[in-house]
Amino acid sequence: MGTVDYAVEMRDITKRFPGVIASNHVNLAVRRGSIHALLGENGAGKSTLMNILTGLLRPDSGEICVRGERAALRSPAAAIALGIGMVHQHFRLVQTFTVAENITLGMSRPRFALDMAPIEREVAKLSSEYGLAVNPRAKIWQLSVGEQQRVEIIKMLYRLSLI
């Protein structure tokens, strides 16, 4: 069990790839309501650590606690369910989908079963509220790099990510 004061704790996290140890017994604790930045040289393991936290990779050893409870982050869906989100440096967007469709990817209900109109309205509201101008009906391939970055940010706002 972790400390409830922390939004997330990563303890003794190790991740190996063939020929390299990407994360070697890393510890990270982030208090609720605080802002942290990971800094380091290329290849230092920052992205690996964040990919573990968001369920894209599994650690070889170590444990993760979210809000004081041990968490098994076996997939991005598991991380999303715990309120963990990440604005990716390399966008994880489907080019042929709309902004609104991309925002709903990975959520609990299948995309084809969703009525997109309320989602588009909410995306437009978040876009306006946070000054992140983007058209919810635009296809990703139609957007500039800056607009695609805004979609990644709006995705986390829409999902109410806590971490």
Model-derived segments and their meaning:
Residues 1-163:
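Glycine-rich phosphate-binding loops of nucleotide-dependent enzymes
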